[in-house]
């Protein structure tokens, strides 16, 4: 095992015996092999596309495979084994399709190598052995940390892109260019000798395609559920039966809301599902009552205390405790051997569990958080914002968002939010919002000082707002009174970062620690070209932003 794809990786280097996320060496090896299997599929899919043959079912499988390997998505070796065996069958079908397509065009098929040729072992232990041979550790030995790190920066950007593309596809939105790029990247990683400049070029292209994906998902979410509207959200509970929904998938929540109409079961969001309350087609359900708990890393205590079942959608699942594992349900790609997997969005077992559970005995304390500041909501008050900036009432915008996590160093983001002067407006998104939303920031020029823009993918909203303000002021985005302070944890944050770099956004602060896979020479390139910097102390960073007391 050698895994360094998330921010909390052991010793800031790599997890080598068990993941700090909780995944075992067995699961890590199967995930490494699933990446290799996806590369093998892409080797054929890439060439078939060059012949004018697109295969949406292969696109979907490869994107799902990549999403499966994102941090805290799948801990289930049995599910991973199923995916691997399906990948081998699909690869054989693709080989036959490719050979037939070449024959029909009277051309000779290329002789492929590497992942295109892998054969699944007959046992799970054999698959694990094959996966271990595909470990990052072997590439580090063969080609060194710099080239390996660039390859993995690209791979992790594509993993996050795949996650967002999967969410969009669930809501009926796809884009051919996304799958085409993914197949190109995986084919390159499978076949082409590592070259730093070529890899860096693909990394930057990954950012450009990531913008396409973020736009795609924004259109998918708003097309299905309307444009988010500023909405007060109860941060607590009321008496009654209850289901808690965590993760990111809005369609899972929408279907559950419809299936629980009139049953006397209240639905609560957790973690990054908080922004769901701003969507008109979701908040119309009166039994979408409020938000319970905070960010993903607090789930083991918060789920244990919740008096009903929990539905985990997409990623951010942790190994459950005995206190709630019999109440934990999963759907979609998220998988854990100790949770009950639901298929086809049939939530009847989940609902039955809620009806059998005690629920909340009484109402809790009443506190509200204002969510729903998507780009259309913010741009709807753009004239007020522009006037406030020109009048000097707003001195700076500070985006504090991204992922949250366990480390005590993440208190930096709390402290930064609490130390900002009253003429600074805070934009937030992702589960990093839970580091700032407990601060009472009041208003400025008749507007809330804290604008919650949504989930991590709603970095797209921040981009749209920044572009619109830059146009209104007649300047570039980098000339705006705007500072970006991003907390990262997993691969979707890498995707968002690359999207920002593709727009030419400079001077992004990243923390609490820099990625282990970005070596000093690679970091120097990012610093020289984009001004990326690690977070410092709050006092130092406020001074650099021109916000010192």
UniProtKB/Swiss-Prot annotation:
Keywords: 4Fe-4S, Cytoplasm, Iron, Iron-sulfur, Metal-binding, Oxidoreductase. Hybrid [4Fe-2O-2S] cluster binds at residues 248, 272, 316, 403, 431, 456, 490, 492. One of its GO terms (biological process) is response to hydrogen peroxide. CDD domains: HCP. Its cofactor is [4Fe-4S] cluster; hybrid [4Fe-2O-2S] cluster. [4Fe-4S] cluster binds at residues 3, 6, 15, 21. SUPFAM superfamilies: Prismane protein-like (SSF56821). It comes from the Bacteria. InterPro entries: HCP/CODH, Hydroxylam_reduct, Prismane-like_a/b-sand, Prismane-like_sf, Prismane_a-bundle. Its EC number is 1.7.99.1. Binds 1 [4Fe-4S] cluster. The modification Cysteine persulfide is found at residue 403. The keyword Iron-sulfur applies. It is found in: Cytoplasm. GO terms for cellular component: cytoplasm. It catalyses: A + NH4(+) + H2O = hydroxylamine + AH2 + H(+). Belongs to the HCP family. NCBIfam families: hybrid_clust, PRK05290.1. Catalyzes the reduction of hydroxylamine to form NH(3) and H(2)O. This is Hydroxylamine reductase. It comes from Rhodospirillum rubrum (strain ATCC 11170 / ATH 1.1.1 / DSM 467 / LMG 4362 / NCIMB 8255 / S1). The lineage of its organism: Bacteria, Pseudomonadati, Pseudomonadota, Alphaproteobacteria, Rhodospirillales. The gene is hcp.
């Amino acid at each position: 095992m050698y895994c360094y794809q998330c921010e909390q990786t052991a010793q800031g280097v790599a997890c080598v015996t068990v993941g700090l996320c909780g995944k075992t060496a067995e699961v890590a090896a199967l995930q490494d092999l699933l990446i290799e299997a996806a590369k093998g599929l892409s080797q054929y899919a890439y060439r078939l596309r060059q012949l004018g043959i697109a295969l949406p079912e292969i696109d979907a499988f490869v994107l799902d495979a990549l999403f499966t390997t994102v941090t805290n998505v799948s801990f289930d070796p049995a599910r991973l084994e199923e995916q691997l065996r399906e990948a081998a069958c699909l690869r054989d079908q693709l080989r036959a399709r490719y050979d037939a397509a070449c024959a029909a065009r009277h051309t000779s098929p290329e002789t492929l190598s590497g992942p295109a040729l892998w054969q699944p072992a007959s046992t799970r232990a054999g698959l694990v052995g094959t996966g271990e041979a595909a470990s990052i550790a072997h590439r580090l030995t063969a080609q060194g940390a710099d080239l390996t790190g660039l390859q993995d920066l690209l791979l992790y950007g594509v993993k996050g892109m795949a996650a967002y593309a999967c969410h969009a596809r669930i809501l009926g939105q796809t884009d051919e260019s996304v799958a085409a790029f993914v197949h190109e990247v995986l084919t390159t990683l499978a076949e082409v000798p590592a070259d730093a400049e070529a890899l860096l070029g693909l990394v930057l292209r990954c950012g450009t395609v990531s913008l396409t994906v973020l736009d795609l998902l924004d259109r998918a979410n708003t097309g299905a559920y309307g444009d988010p509207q500023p909405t007060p959200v109860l941060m607590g509970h009321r008496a009654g039966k209850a289901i808690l929904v965590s993760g990111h998938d809005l369609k899972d929540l929408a279907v559950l809301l419809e299936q629980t109409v009139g049953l006397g079961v209240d639905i609560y969001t957790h973690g990054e599902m908080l922004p769901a309350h701003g969507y008109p087609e979701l908040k119309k359900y009166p039994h979408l009552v409020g938000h319970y708990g905070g960010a993903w890393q607090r789930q083991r205590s918060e789920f244990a205390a919740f008096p009903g079942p929990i539905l985990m959608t997409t990623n951010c699942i942790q190994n459950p405790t005995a206190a709630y594992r019999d109440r934990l349900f999963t759907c979609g790609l998220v998988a854990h051997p100790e949770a009950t997997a639901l298929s086809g969005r049939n939530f009847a077992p989940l609902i039955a569990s809620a009806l059998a559970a005690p629920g909340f005995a009484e109402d809790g304390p009443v506190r509200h958080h204002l969510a729903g500041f998507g780009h259309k909501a913010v741009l709807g008050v753009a004239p007020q914002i522009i006037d406030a900036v020109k009048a000097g009432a707003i001195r700076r915008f500070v985006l504090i968002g991204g992922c949250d996590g366990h480390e005590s160093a993440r208190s930096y983001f709390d402290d930064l939010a609490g130390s900002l002067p009253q003429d600074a407006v805070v934009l937030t998104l992702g589960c990093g919002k839970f580091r700032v939303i407990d601060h009472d920031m009041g208003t400025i020029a008749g507007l809330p000082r804290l604008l919650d823009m949504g989930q991590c993918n709603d970095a797209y909203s921040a981009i749209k707002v920044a572009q619109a303000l830059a146009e209104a002021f007649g300047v570039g985005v980098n000339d705006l009174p705007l500072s970006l302070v991003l907390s990262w944890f997993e691969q979707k944050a890498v995707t968002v970062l690359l999207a920002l770099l593709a727009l030419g956004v400079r001077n992004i602060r990243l923390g609490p620690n820099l990625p282990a896979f970005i070596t000093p020479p690679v970091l120097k390139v990012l610093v020289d070209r984009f001004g990326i910097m690690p977070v410092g102390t709050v006092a130092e960073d406020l001074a650099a932003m021109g916000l010192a007391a």
